[in-house]
Design a protein with these regions (language model features):
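Charged, low-complexity intrinsically disordered segments
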Residues: 4-7, 14-204
Length: 204
């Protein structure tokens, strides 16, 4: 397991310049590691997927960081972002599944149209009557949930990436590389949200 130190800008480990801009690149987890090392010989390569073998696995939306407020549902929390996203889906013949809010093993969490039929939308809260379209749900459910995790559960690791990225390139690996919140054709890259958060332009 890789160990990462959180470097302080006041320490001598990295002579960090607060004016330096972070150098963060998003790449596909499907690329061979040897290829990535050739393309980015000076970079630190960090896997932020659910298959990461170190503490950066906590960045995965599937990871049970715990205590995440379920949007539009006062008093209810879930253990993972993916559990909320999948749990609030409503299909033609199947409603929400709140059991996913407490699922910790990161397995078999996706609820698909192949299994449940056409999706109608995401319910706006567990007890809500309104169904949100895909992009609206992405903005009102997924984005705030993931931001909450970054701000409340992962600040130590966020700081590590921020400081390192000001001194050398950081490559974040994700299975999805779509950074466009408004592109419905591809799942949103959570690695791109980490990058955006560190660069101060997290989508709202």
């Amino acid at each position: 397991m890789m160990k990462i130190n959180v470097y302080s800008e006041k320490s001598g480990n990295f002579a960090s310049d607060s004016k330096k801009k972070p150098m963060i690149i998003i790449e596909s987890k499907k690329k061979k590691l040897e290829t990535l090392k050739k393309e980015y010989p000076d970079a630190m390569i960090i896997d932020v997927t659910s298959h990461a073998q170190d503490e950066f696995v906590k960045f995965s939306p599937f990871y049970p960081n715990g205590g995440i407020p379920v949007p539009f549902t006062e008093g209810l929390v879930a253990v993972s972002v993916e559990g909320i996203w999948q749990g609030l889906k409503v299909f033609e013949n199947v409603d929400i599944d709140t059991s996913l809010f407490s699922k910790r093993d990161m397995k078999n969490m996706k609820r698909t149209t192949r299994k449940y039929g056409p999706i109608r939308g995401h319910r706006k809260g567990v007890r809500g009557e309104e169904l949100l379209g895909y992009l609206t749900a992405r903005k009102l459910i997924y984005l705030p949930c993931y931001k909450w995790v970054l701000e409340n559960k992962l600040q130590k690791l966020v700081t590590a990436i921020r400081v390192i990225s000001k001194n050398k390139p950081v490559v974040l690996l994700d299975y999805n590389t779509n950074p466009d919140v408004y592109n419905p054709k591809s799942p949103l890259s959570h690695a791109s949200l980490i990058k955006a958060y560190i660069e101060g332009n997290y989508p709202e």
